[in-house]
Amino acid sequence: MPIGPARMPLMDHLGELRRRLTIVVVSVLAATVFMYFAAPTLVDILKDPINGSLQPGEQLSVMTSLGGFSIKFNIAIKVALAMCTPMIIWQILAFFLPALRPNERRWVVPTVLVATMLFFAGVVFCYMFIAPAAFDWLLGETRSIGVAMPKLEDFINTELLLMIGFGVSFELPLIVFYLAVFHIVPYASFRAAWRYVYVVMLVVSASITPDASPVTLIFMYAVMLSLYEVSLMITRFVVVARDGKAGLTESRLGLFGDDEDDDE
């Protein structure tokens, strides 16, 4: 859909916001209905990470009469939101596009593509590596004190939240990149404040891991640290190539000092 660069009055902005919110809501609702009927297949896919951890005689159980509907609806709404992520990101960026400078608008489409790829990379990484290790550890802890009777609803909910958490955490490089490249937060500030950043990432990792197990916490923290350092390396290369070393300390908003030295 076309996006005009012209400035609009307040009421036109509100009308544009309502139109884009309507597109998002209708799209998510339609995707939810479709995913609800595809839920049995999705359940089989989501059960794979735990199947290898189940011992003979153990099986995932549904304890209530409403459990089947609850599981299918839970899967449908969360998968629909994940599948609509590219469209949601596009609608957000398209709404703010008229406020951007011409040389900044060319970043919009690449941003949508990269953000989408990073999100789904995080989801796939969690599904293939994190979820199997986490549930293997959790079931082992359960068996050490009693008989394991894993509930399908709890497992599915935890797995979906884990995958969404890792998908969001994989957006970290994009956030750091744009903050530094557009000189909102200088690269030098990111590098100088690494101790505080590491502590914040540890707190965030503990907050967004729904199972509270040390396995997922350690994996999440390691992933966020790795992504942060890689994003800083890429950002430094781009900023120096475009603006020279002076760009490493430049701040457009003036919120951070320009006298910080690049310690690399």
Residue ranges and their predicted role:
Residues 1-264:
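Membrane topogenic/interface segments and analogous intrinsically disordered interaction regions
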